């Protein structure tokens, strides 16, 4: 069955390779979770790009105003799945996504990485009581999300967003750091080039080096296709299974994404914590048609 899925995957990718490989990638799609089986509803799953569509798809709004709290925008979650909490601006257009891991699950993991000390994770209560560590990313300038938002015309022209901002602290405006939109602008930054993986792209890891300590591990990797940011991924130490949106790369597969030489602490932390749980977010229309 796996061989059939891989064969189908290859055929679809080959057919799509004939579609304008020279044009710049656009952000017209919003999907999560990588996988080989294109027939699975879990793989490259589409997420709603508008607040109204989110409601019709079964997502419910979390408590909180658009601004004035730990995060920006109106947040929507489906059921109790904190792995993909979608953020919309005040006009109801997609503005970002959060990736959350319940504190109860984190406390079961044997890891030297501190979720409390990492500025990339913010602890928040949802549904009145459950504490969740959230990584928050925005797809438009954080300053506009609750200050006018995007117009319908802007959304139609720009698609899912105009860039990627990672909230790296308690203030969603002041502490949100923009990731370079083009790969050429990575030069001279702290982003370190890792491996290229077909159907994903070229991975970049912030501050990664051979002798780093995993207490400094940054849980977001930026991924480029044909020189432009087209997707990214969240990655946390621990084997979390509360959501079907998670990916669980083997230790061997994980090394394919990492910089060379591979940070020594990551393999150690992988064994100690029981693995890594990741979730890719894709903006390109046909993410499975990405070649190295």
Model-derived regions: residue spans:
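N-terminal signal peptide
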Residues: 11-26
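Primary mode marks residue(s) on the alpha4-beta5-alpha5 output face of response regulator receiver
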Residues: 22-292
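Classical eukaryotic N-terminal signal peptides for Sec-dependent ER targeting/secretion
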Residues: 1-11
């Amino acid at each position: 069955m796996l061989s059939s899925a891989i064969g189908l995957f290859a055929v679809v990718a080959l057919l799509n390779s004939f579609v304008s490989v020279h044009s710049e990638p656009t952000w017209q799609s919003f999907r999560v979770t990588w996988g080989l089986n294109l027939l699975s509803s879990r793989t490259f799953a589409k997420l709603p790009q508008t607040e109204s569509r989110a409601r019709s798809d079964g997502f419910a709004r979390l408590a909180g105003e658009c601004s004035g709290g730990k995060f920006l925008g109106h947040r929507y979650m489906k059921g109790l799945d904190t792995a993909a909490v979608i953020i919309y601006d005040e006009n109801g257009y997609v503005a970002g996504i959060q990736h959350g891991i319940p504190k109860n699950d984190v406390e079961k993991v044997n890891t030297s990485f501190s979720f409390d000390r990492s500025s990339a994770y913010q602890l928040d209560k949802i549904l009145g009581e459950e504490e969740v560590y959230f990584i928050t990313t925005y797809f438009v300038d954080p300053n506009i999300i609750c200050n006018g938002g995007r117009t319908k015309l802007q959304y139609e022209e720009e698609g899912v967003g105009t860039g990627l901002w990672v909230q790296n602290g308690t203030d969603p405006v002041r502490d949100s750091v923009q990731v370079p939109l083009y790969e050429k602008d990575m030069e001279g930054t702290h982003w370190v080039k890792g491996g290229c993986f077909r159907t994903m792209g070229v991975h970049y890891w912030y501050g990664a080096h051979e002798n780093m300590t995993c207490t400094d591990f940054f849980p977001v990797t930026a991924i480029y296709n044909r020189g432009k940011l087209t997707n990214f991924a969240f990655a946390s130490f621990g084997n979390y299974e509360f959501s079907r949106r998670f990916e669980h790369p083997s230790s061997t597969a994980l090394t394919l994404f990492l910089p060379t030489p591979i940070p020594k602490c990551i393999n150690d932390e992988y064994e100690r914590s029981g693995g890594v749980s990741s979730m890719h977010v894709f903006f390109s229309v046909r993410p499975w048609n990405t070649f190295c």
